[in-house]
Amino acid sequence: MSLFKRLFTALRTGSVSSDEWDQIRSTLIASDLGVKLVDEVIEKVKSAKPDDAVLAITTHVKSWLSNKSRELFLDSDRLNTILIVGVNGTGKTTSTAKLANRLTKSDSKVLLAAADTFRAAATEQLQTWAGRIPVEIVTGEINSDPASVAFSAATKAKTENFNYLLIDTAGRLHTKQDLMDELGKVVRVITKQSPVDEILLVIDATTGQNGINQAKIFIEAVGVTGFIITKLDLSLIHISEPTRPY
């Protein structure tokens, strides 16, 4: 019998021991739900009537998640610029390609920008995706200024009447201020040609608690408007709670 089934069975009989509560707490924390939120869940369950325990948990967990409905794919009659950001290895390039593929299904004219000019084969990876979708792509020389690539792409997208510009950026540690400043420069340069409509932070959900620190710092640096969560697990709830309403 699963942990929660045992819990709900025990609640209905009014017989949850102190050791069982400790086990439940440890299991939830190990699932990366976060200490604060785990304690809130347990308190809600303890204070609920036995028959209301399931509803108490689901209602409380849902309250941590945003219920604000928002369409990511904006006004297709104008240029929409979407910047993809995040630390190394989270899946930014693949996520960029998936977004591009989704947009082309609605007959939108999409341009990709390979602004990750530092990672080996990053440009080639995005070029491969661009060829498969297919969509056009703007690239730069290896180790060239990412802001320059972004600006060239923004110029092309604006003058050639693209509906969407998706910019894949280099992975950067959120603890490196110089790299975060460089990302801010990319945003400033793009806005000379067109407003940045969305800044999407890609987070590998298996990073656990560190995902919160990543989210907070990227929000402060460039004003994140949304998240792409890869390798999804309970971390989504934990990250979502302190970063609402993003």
Where are the regions that the model predicts?
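Single conserved hydrophobic/aromatic residue that forms the stacking wall/gate
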Residues: 238-246
